[in-house]
């Protein structure tokens, strides 16, 4: 049997779809999977059992689908975890016998993990037994990029791919790191040009204070990103893909929320996570940039509040 799966585009969504993917795998044993999607989502599942990985070419996706139809041959079943119309066209071109499409308007107020699980459960008339986030990587912990030297590791993740509205101020991240620098060594995570600027700003503030810090922005693959997040003792993050990766490994996490719905994208079933957010009338706006131009949901959320939550996490 051959199953084609169009993965979610964003890293965080792909992580949150993992229980649903493993529900498919559990239901269809000894099946060949074709995992198709963005560079980051396919990298996340590169080691998924019995799978062929295909990176989607957005510029020529329909021409690519025609080529795949010849290359892959008969596909018995397909699932699109994206609700975009382009997914419907791709699966139509592939001429899959049975096709199932994720509808983002169903279960609108549920957590994204449950939305994906309900999609698979309802499509296949099954009940998923496994609801934890899971990634297929076999991680190695004996050779970390940074040695503890008796200290714990504090990870900072100042970026968020969705847009600037989700990003807490770089100076705030630096202030939190300074507060815990006596007991922790610092790792900074990020990817892309915009996040490089944020990470560099934090790095410079900390280096000027002679703090031991390593800037990993744009220096990791998806697998080594997971490796290093899993090695952290504490993780401070915006609502982002790396936040969900920290949840996979049940890392002590403080998740900072502003314009997005924490009820839908909060760290899933991680008892080691604390959410930090304000309660402003304009929240959640769900916009990439602040429509009111003041960005108070993040600017008025001061480092002291995050430090307070970290201390709660650190208390036995």
Curated annotation (Swiss-Prot):
Cellular-component GO terms for this entry: cytosol
Organism of this sequence: Campylobacter jejuni subsp. jejuni serotype O:6 (strain 81116 / NCTC 11828)
Protein name, entry field: Lipooligosaccharide heptosyltransferase 2
Role, per record: Glycosyltransferase involved in the biosynthesis of the core oligosaccharide region of lipooligosaccharide (LOS). Catalyzes the addition of the second heptose unit to the heptosyl-Kdo2-lipid A module.
Keywords: Glycosyltransferase, Transferase
Domain of life: Bacteria
CDD domains, A to Z: GT9_LPS_heptosyltransferase (cd03789)
GO BP term, pick one: lipopolysaccharide core region biosynthetic process
Entry EC no(s): 2.4.99.24
SUPFAM superfamilies cross-referenced by the UniProt entry: UDP-Glycosyltransferase/glycogen phosphorylase
Pathway terms, separated by semicolons: Bacterial outer membrane biogenesis; LOS core biosynthesis
Entry similarity comment: Belongs to the glycosyltransferase 9 family.
Catalysis: reaction(s): an L-alpha-D-Hep-(1->5)-[alpha-Kdo-(2->4)]-alpha-Kdo-(2->6)-lipid A + ADP-L-glycero-beta-D-manno-heptose = an L-alpha-D-Hep-(1->3)-L-alpha-D-Hep-(1->5)-[alpha-Kdo-(2->4)]-alpha-Kdo-(2->6)-lipid A + ADP + H(+)
InterPro entries for the chain: Glyco_trans_9, LPS_LOS_Heptosyltrfase, RfaF
Knockout or disruption consequences: Mutant synthesizes a truncated LOS molecule, but mutation does not affect the mobility and intensity of the high-molecular-weight polysaccharides.
One example GO MF annotation: ADP-heptose-lipopolysaccharide heptosyltransferase activity
């Amino acid at each position: 049997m051959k199953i084609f799966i169009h993965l979610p585009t964003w890293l965080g969504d792909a992580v949150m779809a993992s229980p649903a993917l493993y529900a498919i795998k559990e239901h269809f044993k000894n099946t060949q999977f074709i995992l198709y999607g963005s560079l980051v989502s396919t990298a996340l599942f590169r080691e998924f059992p019995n799978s062929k990985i295909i990176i989607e070419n957005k510029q020529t996706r329909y021409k690519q689908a025609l080529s795949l139809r010849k290359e892959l041959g008969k596909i018995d079943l397909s699932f699109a975890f994206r609700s975009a119309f382009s997914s419907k066209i791709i699966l139509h071109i592939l001429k899959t016998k049975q096709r199932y499409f994720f509808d983002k308007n169903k279960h609108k107020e549920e957590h994204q993990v449950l939305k994906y699980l309900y999609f698979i459960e309802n499509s296949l008339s099954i009940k998923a037994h496994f609801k934890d986030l899971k990634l297929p990587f076999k991680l190695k912990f004996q050779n970390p990029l940074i040695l503890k030297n008796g200290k714990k590791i504090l990870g900072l993740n100042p970026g968020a791919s969705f847009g600037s509205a989700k990003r807490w101020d770089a100076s705030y991240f630096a202030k939190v790191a300074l507060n815990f620098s006596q007991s922790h060594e610092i790792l900074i995570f990020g990817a892309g040009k915009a996040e490089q600027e944020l990470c560099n700003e934090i790095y410079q503030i900390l280096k000027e204070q002679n703090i031991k810090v390593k800037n990993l922005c744009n220096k990791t693959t998806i697998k080594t990103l997971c490796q290093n997040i899993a090695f952290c003792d504490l993780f401070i993050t915006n609502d982002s893909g790396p936040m969900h990766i920290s949840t996979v490994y049940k890392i002590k996490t403080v998740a900072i929320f502003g314009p997005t719905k924490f009820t839908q994208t909060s760290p899933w079933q991680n008892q080691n996570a604390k959410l930090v957010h304000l309660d402003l009338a304009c929240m959640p706006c769900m916009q990439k940039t602040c429509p009111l131009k003041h960005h108070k949901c993040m600017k008025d959320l001061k480092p002291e509040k995050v430090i307070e939550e970290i201390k709660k996490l650190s208390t036995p």
